[in-house]
Amino acid sequence: MSGQADTATTAEARTPAHAAHHLVEGVARVLTKPRFRGWIHVYSAGTAVLAGASLVAVSWAVGSAKAGLTTLAYTAATITMFTVSATYHRVNWKSATARNWMKRADHSMIFVFIAGSYTPFALLALPAHDGRVVLSIVWGGAIAGILLKMCWPAAPRSVGVPLYLLLGWVAVWYTATILHNAGVTALVLLFVGGALYSIGGILYAVRWPDPWPTTFGYHEFFHACTAVAAICHYIAMWFVVF
């Protein structure tokens, strides 16, 4: 009986009606996706490659091997995050399975990006002990966040967004030390970038504003905030290294 049921299910899955249903769903996704969806992160990924390469090269040549390695970790995390996001949002995935796995990867890479952004600050702008503590917190939190996104992809935004925010504001506990070792400019840029990331995360969570749903919606505001915040943190890296 089980074999007959499986055969019936397979036959049903191959019917024209079933195929038409999937076609309609696919067309609906394409038509409802804002035209700007993903493009901000496409350009951000390309910019990150060029800007990151210059930062790593100069850090290694003029700074130190530690500066080169830490900025390399930061650059790799930034490029990967923007690339995965751009790929997920620009491609019209025909396979629901592939789309769901890319969504998990997209959300997971935000945790890697946060930890990667902290790495130069932790190893170059903090005392050795404090730096190790920060690295343990942010990378441990990143691993936990990745496991959450991979194992519980349907987790509500009220769970994921607060985790991003909590992990992103670890630097608050080391404000005085960062100010002393990296300077006021680096600290201001760090906090301005953090504020923009937080604002973007909140806009994503509440799905607002959404003024032009077919062109530039709330998700694009979120991506715009992350792009500008990344610029702030990139500039801050130069002050941390030099």
UniProtKB/Swiss-Prot annotation:
Q: Where in the cell is it found?
A: Cell membrane
Q: Which keywords has UniProt assigned to this entry?
A: Cell membrane, Membrane, Transmembrane, Transmembrane helix
Q: Using the record, list the residue span of the signal peptide; answer none if the entry has no such feature.
A: none
Q: Which InterPro entries match?
A: AdipoR/HlyIII-related (IPR004254), Hy-lIII (IPR005744)
Q: Which GO terms describe its cellular component?
A: plasma membrane
Membrane-protein topology: Multi-pass membrane protein
- Its domain of life? Bacteria
Sections of the chain in a coiled coil? none
Q: Where are the transmembrane segments?
A: 42-62, 67-87, 108-128, 133-153, 159-179, 186-206, 222-242
Q: What Pfam families does this protein's entry cite?
A: HlyIII (PF03006)
GO MF, one annotated term: pore-forming activity
- Determine if Thylakoid is one of this entry's keywords: no
Record-linked NCBIfam families: hlyIII
The family database entries (PANTHER family) matched by this protein are listed as: ADIPOR/PROGESTIN RECEPTOR-RELATED, LD03007P
The text of the family note is: Belongs to the UPF0073 (Hly-III) family.
Protein name, per record: UPF0073 membrane protein Mb1114c
Organism name: Mycobacterium bovis (strain ATCC BAA-935 / AF2122/97)
